[in-house]
């Protein structure tokens, strides 16, 4: 997907992308429910978003308002199946890394189980129920609150 009005995020921008997502979702009700302990949430979220950013950069279209990345848009063209196996294995790898971080930061595995129970809210499987062959799924839309 090409867009003349948006900046196409580059690999060099991934740290900033992770930072924006961490800031924007810091007090998100869903993440607060999944990661109940605030200290654990603050330690864990940068790692979780690092996994998401890696996966999204490999499998989705990632745009920003400008090279400063004040606002970001990550979309998945779910009608494009050209790289389905590659995307599956990238997602699988990042899911395993995410699970590792969940257990590392909360050895009680409570947070890990919260994510397992909340997986329906954290994936795009529900879009199959739309019965549309051409879908563009917005994965993340976030704006740095500083701007």
Which role fits each region the language model picked out?
Residues 38-61, 125-127:
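Active-site rim helix/loop that mediates acceptor-substrate recognition in acyltransferases
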Residues 74-140:
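Conserved acyl-donor/pantetheine-binding loop and adjacent beta-alpha core of acyl/acetyltransferases
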Residues 57-76, 142-146:
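Conserved beta-hairpin
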Residues 31-32, 63, 80:
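Short, polar/charged, Gly/Pro-enriched helix-capping and turn/loop motifs at alpha-helix termini
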Residues 19-39, 51-55:
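Helix-loop element at the rim of GNAT/NAT acetyltransferase active sites that forms part
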Residues 13, 56-59, 131-133, 137, ...:
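Hydrophobic, aromatic-enriched alpha-helical segments typical of multi-pass transmembrane helices
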Residues 5-19, 27:
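A short beta-loop-alpha structural element at the N-terminal edge
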